[in-house]
C-alpha cells in the first residue's frame, strides 16, 4: 500500500488544530528535522517536541487554510495561511510555504516552513 503523504500532512494539521502535541509528534520519524525558517532548526524528536511545547504554551488555538498542495513521491509542498490565536487574545494570520519529506513508513523526516517572522510578531505585539 502506498503512503498518502498529503493525507498525513492534513492529519498533522488536524492535530495542530486540537493543540495535541502528542498527536503531532506521532507523525515524525525519530531523526526528523523541523526547519522552521527563520527560527532555529530542531533536529530529532526531543528537540521538535521542545519547540512545539514552546509554541503551544502561549497559544489558545490554531487553524490552517491550505491554498495549494502539490505532491510528488515522498514530498508534499504547500502554500497556506496559518492562523495562531494567543492566550493574550491576540491573533496572527501568517502566509507560509512548506515542504514535507517522508520516509518509507510515512513518517515526516523533514518539515521545512518559510514565513516572515515580522508578520507574526507585529500581529501579536
Regions found by a protein language model. Give the residues of each.
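Hydrophobic/aromatic beta-strand elements that line small-molecule binding cavities or substrate pockets
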Residues: 52, 64-69, 81-82, 95-101
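Short beta-strand edge/turn micro-motifs at domain boundaries
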Residues: 95, 99-122
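Short, low-complexity N-terminal intrinsically disordered segments enriched in polar/charged residues
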Residues: 1-30, 124-125
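Residue-level signal for well-ordered, solvent-exposed loop/turn and beta-edge residues enriched
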Residues: 33, 90, 106-107
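Short, cysteine-centered beta-strand-loop-beta hairpins and adjacent loop/turn segments enriched
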Residues: 84-91
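A solvent-exposed, acidic/Ser-Thr-rich amphipathic alpha-helical stretch
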Residues: 21-74
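Polar/charged side chains located within well-ordered beta-strands of beta-rich proteins
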Residues: 78-80, 113
